[in-house]
Amino acid sequence: MGEKRKSRQAEVNIGMVGHVDHGKTTLTKALTGVWTDTHSEELRRGITIKIGFADAEIRRCPNCGRYSTSPVCPYCGHETEFVRRVSFIDAPGHEALMTTMLAGASLMDGAILVIAANEPCPRPQTREHLMALQIIGQKNIIIAQNKIELVDKEKALENYRQIKEFIEGTVAENAPIIPISALHGANIDVLVKAIEDFIPTPKRDPNKPPKMLVLRSFDVNKPGTPPEKLVGGVLGGSIVQGKLKVGDEIEIRPGVPYEEHGRIKYEPITTEIVSLQAGGQFVEEAYPGGLVGVGTKLDPYLTKGDLMAGNVVGKPGKLPPVWDSLRLEVHLLERVVGTEQELKVEPIKRKEVLLLNVGTARTMGLVTGLGKDEIEVKLQIPVCAEPGDRVAISRQIGSRWRLIGYGIIKE
């Protein structure tokens, strides 16, 4: 049994979302033992910039019935039983990194909204992240009322009432609110049980053509590696349907940029999968859930520094279409989210430039046409997406991009 457990892949992605400094990364560490801020700049500034992934095994103690992520029950010392493996996506809570958070949100099967008990609720990014979950239609939400060790009972209850008021009428209206201390590991068992109860593993059809959204891409070769020892580029992301196998031929869309008559165009590319990594293990097959590393025969120059982020991977000829322009059915929010003062969302104007998040891709769109609740946008970078997919729409307000609504891709 032990060996089988080792190669288990995470079967759901759970987003850690919320305002900067409310304890998302600390909570991820309490659940997984992994500190997801590994970027040097992140450690220096103490905030998450890139999206971090960390896996945990949800386990139940057959003796006392409590849940944990540990092989030995922290409450009674009995050996625990494996329930399932989950992957936590630690998304940035800083306002300037909202578009990164939206890319991560497209991979989430559920979310834990972390709200600090020692600050008034909602803070700007708390509201913004909840809106992002609303926009992508994510209803599997748990609220972790964190830093409970810093407040007395009265303050905790007042904060609880503020949270209840804040979530009324939103996708999180019926979300459980669980008081915890991520720092001291208090009430983590209750949170883990809530994950079991409220964030189910989605039913997936393994026979659908594979589709993976690329979030990161790397050149893993150290400087000075001799040419014969160089390995191909690596794509990091999450499979949203189907499965990938070592040896598969894959297509990547929209692909790589090239110049033609002074204009940048994109060309899909095909390559072969030479290795697959999931949950820190090399595997022969990878499925939806968790971060998957796909080793390819691509020139690592194409994949260095996240250059391939936003692409979609699948079987040649089986991927969604690539769009240079989109027709969107638009749903605007009443007010701009993320700003300290409340601003009304003005209607979209012709020739306005918007920032669009489509899956893990982000692109600028120039508004070329307006209709009733519809817009047409010409894209700076093409995207690979299905009709019916949701697109998050942000507008530049001051020096920041602010979420103002979403669009649904029309044929």
Curated annotation (Swiss-Prot):
Domain tr-type G: 9-203
GO MF, any single term: metal ion binding
Residues covered by region (G3): 90-93
PROSITE patterns per UniProt: G_TR_2
Keyword terms: GTP-binding, Hydrolase, Initiation factor, Magnesium, Metal-binding, Nucleotide-binding, Protein biosynthesis, Zinc
This protein's record includes keyword Magnesium: yes
UniProt superkingdom: Archaea
Residues binding Mg(2+) 1, per UniProt: 25, 48
One GO-annotated biological process of the protein: formation of translation preinitiation complex
Function field: eIF-2 functions in the early steps of protein synthesis by forming a ternary complex with GTP and initiator tRNA.
Name this protein carries in UniProt: Translation initiation factor 2 subunit gamma
